[in-house]
């Protein structure tokens, strides 16, 4: 995760993120939905910093009619009241950020309530490698945006996904990919600088071209990655396993909006 204050005026020269700044992924969803000509959307996220960042990022690029913006309780498991209100609002689309168990419960209750006939569901961090083992077929066809996907076509990612599946018997999540990328970044910094000295490693990461599962990454001035963000669809692979696949690139080399406020 990447809270906006850490990317902005609370940044630190010794902090590097190998994930994303919170706004970036929903910014891509906002752009996709804006470009698709979607007229109205109902927004929902948990009431904490990441939830607020996610919806702020979405609205930065989506300029249609936001007919509702609801902040749910962090850790909430029952969404029947919210779904009833959403049904009454009849938005063309719904965009959610409900990570982890919240997303599992939300999508299952959405399906059980027949909400696909009311509104088209879009999401960020709610249907992914973390939740798909529980959601399975109920997540098929749902679109989301992400900086990584198991089908990204580069040598590092192919090896990572194959090795992970061989050891654990399933697809890795983006958390696993980012953990792998973090180790690659540390190794790169030591190799490039020829040292374990903090200042030299910092300089190597800040100016380098870091090899990762997402391709080679450069760091912004606030030490958050400048990276592609993809549109993904939940599908079944050739073996019938539910996963995600890239169906488009929304942003190429996308930088976050808070780096201008970062002063080391």
Identify the meaning behind each predicted range.
Residues 31-35, 78-90, 112:
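Short, well-structured alpha-helical segments in soluble
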Residues 209-264:
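Solvent-exposed, acidic/polar segments of extracytosolic/periplasmic ligand-binding ectodomains
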Residues 25-28, 72-85, 155-156:
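Structural motif
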Residues 44-52, 101, 149-150, 172-178:
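Extracytoplasmic "Venus flytrap"
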Residues 197-214:
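Short, well-structured alpha-helical segments that form the helix of a local strand-helix-strand
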Residues 1-71, 118-143:
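Extracytoplasmic ligand/sensor domains, especially the bilobed periplasmic-binding protein
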Residues 40-45, 90-100, 106, 118-124, ...:
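Periplasmic-binding protein-like
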Residues 109-180, 191-196, 244-264:
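Extracellular/periplasmic periplasmic-binding protein-like sensory domains
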């Amino acid at each position: 995760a990447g809270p906006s204050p850490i990317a902005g005026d609370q940044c630190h020269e010794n902090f590097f993120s190998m994930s994303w700044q919170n706004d970036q992924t929903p910014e891509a969803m906002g752009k996709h939905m804006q470009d698709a000509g979607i007229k109205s959307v109902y927004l929902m996220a948990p009431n904490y910093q990441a939830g607020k960042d996610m919806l702020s990022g979405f609205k930065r690029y989506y300029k249609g009619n936001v007919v509702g913006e609801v902040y749910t309780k962090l850790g909430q498991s029952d969404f029947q009241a919210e779904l009833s209100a959403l049904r009454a609002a009849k938005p063309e689309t719904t965009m959610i950020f409900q990570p982890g168990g919240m997303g599992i419960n939300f999508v299952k209750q959405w399906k059980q309530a027949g909400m696909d006939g009311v509104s088209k569901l879009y999401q960020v961090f709610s249907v992914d490698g973390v939740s798909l083992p529980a959601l399975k077929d109920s997540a098929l066809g749902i679109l989301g945006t992400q900086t990584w996907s198991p089908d990204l076509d580069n040598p590092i990612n192919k090896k990572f996904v194959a090795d992970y599946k061989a050891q654990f018997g399933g697809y890795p999540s983006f958390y696993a990919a980012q953990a792998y990328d973090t180790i690659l970044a540390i190794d790169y910094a030591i190799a490039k600088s020829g040292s374990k000295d903090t200042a030299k490693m910092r300089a190597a990461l800040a100016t380098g071209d870091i090899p990762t599962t997402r391709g080679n990454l450069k760091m912004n001035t606030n030490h958050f990655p400048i990276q592609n963000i993809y549109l993904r669809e939940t599908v079944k692979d050739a073996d019938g396993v539910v996963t995600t696949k890239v169906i488009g690139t929304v942003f190429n080399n996308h930088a976050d909006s808070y780096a201008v406020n970062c002063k080391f």
